[in-house]
């Protein structure tokens, strides 16, 4: 929607918002700060200041727009901020890869990416009517979720509003979460942890990928 300075593309979102409002469809909006970024943002010549200014403009205007739509109840503020090994997701060379350019904005004095704190600050300031979600990908990788939990608790301790924790349920036949007792138990513990800390828990996406070719009965 705001791929580069001075350029806005609201048409698709406006059409979607008009539809859900007209039909009174309770909705959540997935428009977070994260890897889903423009080639301008991923360009290797970008400076942290340029990225901060563009992100600030984007999150401010998006939050204002969503705040005025009564059927929008939740918004993902940041997405895929931490790798499955528990590291901060950052930039990569080129502009055609899965990367998170916003980490280049810098780290604060506590070693937390500035963009994460700034995104929640802006969303809270401009979308008081919408619940704010910290969204994450991956499976049940312990190192990743430990870092996620640590970051969410840090944000709450510093006074940022975080209303929920989201997990993208991208299931695969070679990572059998549904058939793995330990993974299911960990998911249950993760949901309990969210609730114990006053957070909603959302499965923000759900799909099942079959990589086996041809697929066997076991994959199905």
Predicted regions and their residues:
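Substrate-binding cleft and catalytic face of glycoside hydrolase catalytic domains
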Residues: 1-140, 199, 210-214
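Non-catalytic scaffold segments within catalytic domains of secreted glycoside hydrolases
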Residues: 17, 38-64, 130-220
């Amino acid at each position: 929607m705001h791929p580069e300075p001075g350029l806005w593309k609201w048409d698709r979102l406006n059409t979607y918002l008009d539809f859900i409002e007209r039909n009174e469809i309770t909705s959540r909006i997935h428009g977070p700060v994260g890897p889903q970024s423009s080639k301008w943002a991923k360009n290797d010549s970008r400076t942290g200041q340029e990225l901060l200014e563009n992100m600030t403009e984007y999150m401010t205007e998006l939050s204002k727009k969503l705040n005025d739509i009564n059927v929008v109840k939740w918004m993902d503020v940041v997405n895929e901020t931490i790798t499955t090994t528990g590291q901060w997701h950052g930039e990569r060379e080129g502009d055609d890869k899965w990367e998170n350019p916003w980490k280049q904005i810098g780290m604060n004095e506590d070693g937390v990416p500035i963009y994460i704190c700034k995104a929640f600050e802006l969303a809270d300031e401009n979308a008081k009517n919408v619940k704010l979600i910290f969204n994450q990908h991956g499976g049940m990788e312990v190192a990743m979720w430990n870092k996620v939990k640590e970051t969410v608790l840090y944000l709450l301790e510093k006074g940022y509003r975080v209303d929920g924790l989201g997990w993208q349920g991208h299931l695969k036949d070679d990572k059998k979460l549904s058939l793995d007792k330990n993974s299911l138990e960990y998911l249950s513990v993760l949901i309990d942890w969210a609730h114990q800390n006053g957070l909603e828990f959302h499965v923000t996406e759900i799909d099942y990928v079959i990589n086996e070719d041809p697929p066997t009965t076991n994959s199905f």
